[in-house]
């Protein structure tokens, strides 16, 4: 019975497998948001989001990424620390049927080049602090879009100032690059388009 998996004989009464619903990660998130909408989904240095808000943010991000060219079967390279933007973009890509490819945010340009060649990603999300190595990568298929996020986007005003005073002001500005869009700008564009559609009704 356990010849191919001999470790199972040590499980005792513990189930050797569980029943998992045949749903996508996005669908699992949506189910959680329906079940416990006001539960805390994430806490980022004191800034919190409920599951209901996270789902709304994921839906908006999916629309924004689609507007920037991410399609079903596409790849989104995510080079982020553990921050809200990375979590939101991960589920947004899944909602679109795209594949999020997470890499270490401190990866070097040669490493990023390898990851881009392996995944075939044409779009990437990273922090302003990590733009340099990403821009210096030389994959066979160059990135078509780079979305730049910033840590203060999800901090309270007080902590936003503290971040700028201690670390943020030392981050070099992202140079002019036609491939670059800011995280806040692509989300704002989706909100603006939604507002225009409501006005046209």
Which role fits each region the language model picked out?
Residues 14-23, 163-201:
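Flexible, low-complexity linker/hinge segments
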Residues 2-19:
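Short, charged, surface-exposed hinge/linker loops at domain edges
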Residues 27-29, 62-65, 110-113, 131-136, ...:
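A generic local structural motif
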Residues 19-21, 30, 38-71, 77-83, ...:
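Conserved AMP-binding/adenylate-forming core of the ANL superfamily
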Residues 68, 95-185:
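Structural core segment of the AMP-binding/adenylate-forming
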Residues 33-38, 164:
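A short, compositionally biased
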Residues 41, 73-74, 101, 124:
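A local structural micro-motif
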């Amino acid at each position: 019975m356990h010849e191919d998996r001999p470790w199972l004989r040590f499980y005792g009464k513990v189930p050797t497998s569980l029943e998992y619903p045949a749903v996508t990660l996005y669908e699992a998130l949506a189910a959680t948001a329906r079940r416990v909408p006001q539960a805390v989904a994430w806490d980022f240095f004191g800034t919190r989001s409920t599951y209901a808000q996270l789902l709304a943010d994921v839906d908006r991000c999916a629309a924004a990424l689609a507007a920037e060219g991410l399609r079903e079967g596409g790849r989104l390279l995510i080079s982020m620390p553990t921050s809200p933007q990375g979590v939101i973009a991960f589920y947004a890509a899944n909602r679109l049927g795209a594949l999020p490819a997470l890499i270490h945010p401190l990866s070097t340009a040669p490493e990023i080049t390898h990851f881009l060649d392996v995944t075939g990603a044409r779009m990437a999300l990273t922090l302003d602090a990590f733009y340099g190595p990403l821009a210096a990568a030389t994959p066979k298929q160059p990135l078509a879009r780079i979305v730049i996020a910033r840590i203060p986007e999800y901090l309270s005003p007080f902590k936003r100032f503290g971040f700028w005073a201690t670390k943020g002001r030392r981050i070099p500005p992202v140079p002019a690059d036609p491939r670059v869009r800011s995280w806040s700008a692509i989300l704002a564009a989706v909100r603006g388009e939604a507002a225009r559609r409501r006005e046209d009704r």
